[in-house]
Swiss-Prot record:
Pfam families: ADH_N (PF08240), ADH_zinc_N (PF00107). Its main location: cytoplasm. It is found in: Cytoplasm. This is Alcohol dehydrogenase class-3. Keywords: Acetylation, Cytoplasm, Lipid metabolism, Metal-binding, NAD, Oxidoreductase, Phosphoprotein, Zinc. The modification Phosphoserine is found at residues 247, 324, 351.
Length: 374
């Protein structure tokens, strides 16, 4: 099948705000420096829902969503030397070409080699590999994992341990790595520090896990859904706070509870008001707040400049700061050696035909991550 078009099932988003539709699509063979992957498992993330809602300024339709997947290489295009058919892989929405000025700078993981075309839903040559009912279907985040087969750039693939369970490690393609790395790489949480994590979805729980791994002595979990508190404590939170239980702003509550504020805070929701609260909950002189959640298009953050003048730092992170191609295999190895939790994030497993139910579960707040077996 290496040089042939493959017909397979995919969940197509024909337009914004409508449920996904399981369709038979055609997947063209990989061109030069591309890889065709058989996807075995994918998770559903808030970013997929954000794009499907129509709020994403880069959202284009019709499209095959999905960016937390894992599978096996089916075939490779001309010039691909780092991968071969049969390799176990995780597709990456942030590539690592190793050559652009971003890849060569140790301060960032934001490879820009294919950013322009990826943002338009196209492969690096400006075309798509997907068609359905005679129409071109766009790619998503360079990955499109809601399909039995997908085609990605060879710089957007991490080769991983072939014994890793794909229905678990697919989560390392986004959420877990993002939260975990926000604590370890972006904030660089230190032993004995006090941390606050706002938002206890998958990313927030992973941030708690990262704070614990870094040796934080106090980890305060903040959410308006108290049903999430027990799980937060399982991941390492030392205490949990519901802002709705207080008559004053949550940042004031945290400053009082922590003798002046936390050393590190993490906003894992994408709410600009919470981003402000997370910054203002930080300790004067050295507190660091990391924006992890993605806010809606056009939204802006605000605070009094005095908050920054007096020594607080506001930072942002994408994919937890991990340089993807080199880091994801290491994260999989850490999971295999039980250094990081992954299984505990999977609260539901569904069949491909039930993919719309996965979105419903996520919106209900009752699941952390739902894995869809393709």
């Amino acid at each position: 099948m290496a040089n042939k078009v493959i017909k397979c099932k995919a969940a197509v988003a024909w337009e914004a705000g409508k449920p996904l539709s399981i369709e038979e699509i055609e997947v063209a063979p990989p061109k030069a420096h591309e890889v065709r992957i058989k996807i075995f498992a994918t998770a559903v993330c808030h970013t997929d829902a954000y794009t499907l809602s129509g709020a994403d300024p880069e959202g284009c339709f019709p499209v095959i969503l999905g960016h937390e997947g894992a599978g096996i290489v089916e075939s490779v295009g001309e010039g691909v030397t780092n991968l071969k058919a049969g390799d176990t892989v995780i597709p990456l929405y942030i590539p690592q070409c190793g050559e652009c000025k971003f890849c060569l700078n140790p301060k960032t993981n934001l490879c820009q080699k294919i950013r322009v075309t990826q943002g338009k839903g196209l492969m690096p040559d400006g075309t798509s590999r997907f068609t359905c009912k005679g129409k071109t279907i766009l790619h998503y985040m360079g990955t499109s994992t809601f399909s039995e087969y997908t085609v990605v750039a060879d710089i957007s693939v991490a080769k991983i341990d072939p014994s890793a369970p794909l229905d678990k490690v697919c989560l390392l393609g986004c959420g877990i790595s993002t939260g975990y790395g926000a604590a370890l790489n972006t904030a660089k949480v230190e032993p004995g520090s006090t941390c606050a994590v706002f938002g206890l979805g998958g990313v927030g729980l992973a941030a708690i896990m990262g704070c614990k791994a870094a040796g934080a002595s106090r980890i305060i979990a903040v959410d308006i859904n108290k049903d999430k508190f027990a799980r937060a404590k399982e991941f390492g939170a030392t205490e949990c706070i519901n802002p709705q239980d207080f008559s004053k702003p949550i940042q004031e509550v945290l400053v009082e509870k922590t003798d002046g504020g936390v050393d590190y805070s993490f906003e894992c929701i994408g709410n600009v008001k919470v981003m402000r609260a997370a910054l203002e909950a930080c300790h004067k002189g050295w507190g660091v707040s990391v924006v992890v959640g993605v806010a809606g298009a056009g939204e802006e953050i605000s605070t009094r400049p005095f908050q920054l003048v007096t020594g607080r730092t506001w930072k942002g992170t994408a994919f937890g700061g991990w340089k993807s191609v080199e880091s994801v295999p290491k994260l999989v190895s850490e999971y295999m050696s039980k250094k990081i939790n992954v299984d505990e994030f999977v609260t539901n497993t569904l069949s491909f035909d039930q993919i719309n139910e996965a979105f419903e579960l996520m919106h209900s707040g009752k699941s952390i991550r739902t894995v869809v077996k393709i």
